[in-house]
């Protein structure tokens, strides 16, 4: 029996970074897929702490909130920096990823048709901090923090990949980010995950927009 269970919709959404992390770390997990019809019936939603998914089970521990799940796995699998200073930087990066992910979610679910052009125009300003962070860490040739991968790397990689779908070429003026995406995507287990039918057949978002 896999030690982890992901309860989520049949989309990448806020769970693909967690799935990518688990795959890269050689962990197995069980998926409990919740269709929108089942969700709208309300019985499952009423049992969820915040009335939302994902839900994540690690043995007898049940977690909600995608970033809490990532931080838990970061602590338990050694993906949280080598010391307190690096852990603080990992948290900072992940909060920056969350800020941009929220902007992306608002665009996708509330203002896609009218807001996409303005969003894409503003995107370089939102990507620049991550390029800066890479430049400050071993010349951008390593990870986003330190010399070992962290949960924030998986979250950032997933966010950059979905933005490359939204706005192809969005990383063209960010050579360090472009190389970072290529480098992490080439890690054998991440490469296998990204080319797997499970990943490829999952829509990025629940409304079909990307």
From Swiss-Prot:
<feature type="binding site">
    <location>
        <position position="14"/>
    </location>
    <ligand>
        <name>glutathione</name>
    </ligand>
</feature>
<dbReference type="GO" id="GO:0097057">
    <property type="term" value="C:TRAF2-GSTP1 complex"/>
</dbReference>
<dbReference type="InterPro" id="IPR004045">
    <property type="entry name" value="Glutathione_S-Trfase_N"/>
</dbReference>
<dbReference type="GO" id="GO:0032355">
    <property type="term" value="P:response to estradiol"/>
</dbReference>
<dbReference type="GO" id="GO:0032691">
    <property type="term" value="P:negative regulation of interleukin-1 beta production"/>
</dbReference>
<keyword id="KW-0539">Nucleus</keyword>
<dbReference type="GO" id="GO:0071638">
    <property type="term" value="P:negative regulation of monocyte chemotactic protein-1 production"/>
</dbReference>
<dbReference type="InterPro" id="IPR003082">
    <property type="entry name" value="GST_pi"/>
</dbReference>
<dbReference type="GO" id="GO:1901687">
    <property type="term" value="P:glutathione derivative biosynthetic process"/>
</dbReference>
<dbReference type="GO" id="GO:0035726">
    <property type="term" value="P:common myeloid progenitor cell proliferation"/>
</dbReference>
<keyword id="KW-0597">Phosphoprotein</keyword>
<dbReference type="GO" id="GO:0006749">
    <property type="term" value="P:glutathione metabolic process"/>
</dbReference>
<dbReference type="GO" id="GO:0070664">
    <property type="term" value="P:negative regulation of leukocyte proliferation"/>
</dbReference>
<dbReference type="GO" id="GO:0032720">
    <property type="term" value="P:negative regulation of tumor necrosis factor production"/>
</dbReference>
<protein>
    <recommendedName>
        <fullName>Glutathione S-transferase P</fullName>
        <ecNumber>2.5.1.18</ecNumber>
    </recommendedName>
</protein>
<feature type="domain" description="GST N-terminal">
    <location>
        <begin position="2"/>
        <end position="81"/>
    </location>
</feature>
<feature type="domain" description="GST C-terminal">
    <location>
        <begin position="83"/>
        <end position="204"/>
    </location>
</feature>
<dbReference type="GO" id="GO:1904706">
    <property type="term" value="P:negative regulation of vascular associated smooth muscle cell proliferation"/>
</dbReference>
<dbReference type="GO" id="GO:0005739">
    <property type="term" value="C:mitochondrion"/>
</dbReference>
<dbReference type="GO" id="GO:0015643">
    <property type="term" value="F:toxic substance binding"/>
</dbReference>
<dbReference type="GO" id="GO:0035731">
    <property type="term" value="F:dinitrosyl-iron complex binding"/>
</dbReference>
<dbReference type="GO" id="GO:0071460">
    <property type="term" value="P:cellular response to cell-matrix adhesion"/>
</dbReference>
<dbReference type="GO" id="GO:0071385">
    <property type="term" value="P:cellular response to glucocorticoid stimulus"/>
</dbReference>
<dbReference type="GO" id="GO:0005829">
    <property type="term" value="C:cytosol"/>
</dbReference>
<dbReference type="GO" id="GO:0032873">
    <property type="term" value="P:negative regulation of stress-activated MAPK cascade"/>
</dbReference>
<feature type="binding site">
    <location>
        <begin position="65"/>
        <end position="66"/>
    </location>
    <ligand>
        <name>glutathione</name>
    </ligand>
</feature>
<dbReference type="GO" id="GO:0033591">
    <property type="term" value="P:response to L-ascorbic acid"/>
</dbReference>
<dbReference type="GO" id="GO:0019207">
    <property type="term" value="F:kinase regulator activity"/>
</dbReference>
<dbReference type="GO" id="GO:0071672">
    <property type="term" value="P:negative regulation of smooth muscle cell chemotaxis"/>
</dbReference>
<dbReference type="GO" id="GO:0004364">
    <property type="term" value="F:glutathione transferase activity"/>
</dbReference>
<feature type="modified residue" description="Phosphothreonine">
    <location>
        <position position="62"/>
    </location>
</feature>
<dbReference type="GO" id="GO:0046329">
    <property type="term" value="P:negative regulation of JNK cascade"/>
</dbReference>
<feature type="modified residue" description="Phosphotyrosine; by EGFR">
    <location>
        <position position="4"/>
    </location>
</feature>
<dbReference type="InterPro" id="IPR050213">
    <property type="entry name" value="GST_superfamily"/>
</dbReference>
<dbReference type="GO" id="GO:0043200">
    <property type="term" value="P:response to amino acid"/>
</dbReference>
<feature type="modified residue" description="N6-acetyllysine">
    <location>
        <position position="128"/>
    </location>
</feature>
<comment type="similarity">
    <text>Belongs to the GST superfamily. Pi family.</text>
</comment>
<dbReference type="GO" id="GO:0009636">
    <property type="term" value="P:response to toxic substance"/>
</dbReference>
<dbReference type="GO" id="GO:2001237">
    <property type="term" value="P:negative regulation of extrinsic apoptotic signaling pathway"/>
</dbReference>
<dbReference type="GO" id="GO:0000302">
    <property type="term" value="P:response to reactive oxygen species"/>
</dbReference>
<feature type="binding site">
    <location>
        <position position="45"/>
    </location>
    <ligand>
        <name>glutathione</name>
    </ligand>
</feature>
<dbReference type="Pfam" id="PF02798">
    <property type="entry name" value="GST_N"/>
</dbReference>
């Amino acid at each position: 029996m896999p030690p982890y269970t992901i309860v989520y919709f049949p989309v990448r959404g806020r769970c693909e970074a967690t799935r990518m992390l688990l795959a890269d770390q050689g962990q197995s997990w069980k998926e409990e897929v919740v269709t929108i019809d089942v969700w709208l019936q309300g019985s499952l939603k009423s049992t969820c702490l915040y009335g939302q998914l994902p839900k994540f089970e690690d043995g007898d521990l049940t977690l909600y909130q995608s970033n809490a799940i990532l931080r838990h796995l970061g602590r338990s699998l050694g993906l949280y920096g080598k010391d307190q200073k690096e852990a603080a930087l990992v948290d900072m990066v992940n909060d920056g990823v969350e800020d941009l992910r929220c902007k992306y979610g608002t665009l996708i679910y509330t203002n896609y048709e009218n807001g996409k052009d303005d969003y894409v125009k503003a995107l370089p300003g939102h990507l620049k901090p991550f390029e800066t962070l890479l430049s400050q860490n071993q010349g951008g040739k390593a990870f986003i923090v330190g010399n070992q991968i962290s949960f924030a790397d998986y979250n950032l990689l997933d966010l950059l990949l979905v933005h490359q779908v939204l706005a192809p070429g969005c990383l063209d003026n960010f050579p360090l980010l472009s190389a970072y995406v290529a480098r992490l995507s080439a890690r054998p287990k991440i490469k296998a995950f990204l080319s797997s039918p499970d990943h490829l057949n999952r829509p990025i978002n629940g409304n079909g927009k990307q």
